[in-house]
Amino acid sequence: LVRPPYSYSALIAMAIQSAPRRRLTLSQIYQYVAGNFPFYKRTKAGWQNSIRHNLSLNDCFKKVPRDENDPGKGNYWMLDPNCEKMFDNGNFRRKRRRRGE
């Protein structure tokens, strides 16, 4: 299987944007990625850690606490509205680096 041409940030954004309420738990993000990209279903090594790393360090992703009437584990993750246009029109492909950058 070939690795999809998307960054981890793009995979996370796709997952969040696919959700009816535009927010998902970490576990739901994993399920989306593995369910839509067989490469990640077969490859256990490290991709989940990379997803967590991106959620924590990328300012485009905001952690949102669960409502009191929403049982379960973990917070939700949402896309910062300022970052949504980065992924408009399904533009999730990796940006190619130009020579000299």
Curated annotation (Swiss-Prot):
Its job: Possible transcriptional activator.
Recorded GO CC terms: nucleus
UniProt keyword annotation of DNA-binding present: yes
Reported tissue expression: Low levels in lung and liver.
Single Gene Ontology BP annotation: regulation of transcription by RNA polymerase II
DNA-binding segment(s): 2-93
Origin organism lineage: Eukaryota, Metazoa, Chordata, Craniata, Vertebrata
InterPro entries: Fork_head_dom, FOX_domain-containing, TF_fork_head_CS_1, TF_fork_head_CS_2, WH-like_DNA-bd_sf, WH_DNA-bd_sf
Name of the protein described by the UniProt record: Forkhead box protein I2
This protein's UniProt keywords: Activator, DNA-binding, Nucleus, Transcription, Transcription regulation
Primary location: nucleus
Compartments (UniProt record): Nucleus
MF terms in GO: DNA-binding transcription factor activity; DNA-binding transcription factor activity, RNA polymerase II-specific; RNA polymerase II cis-regulatory region sequence-specific DNA binding
Organism: Rattus norvegicus
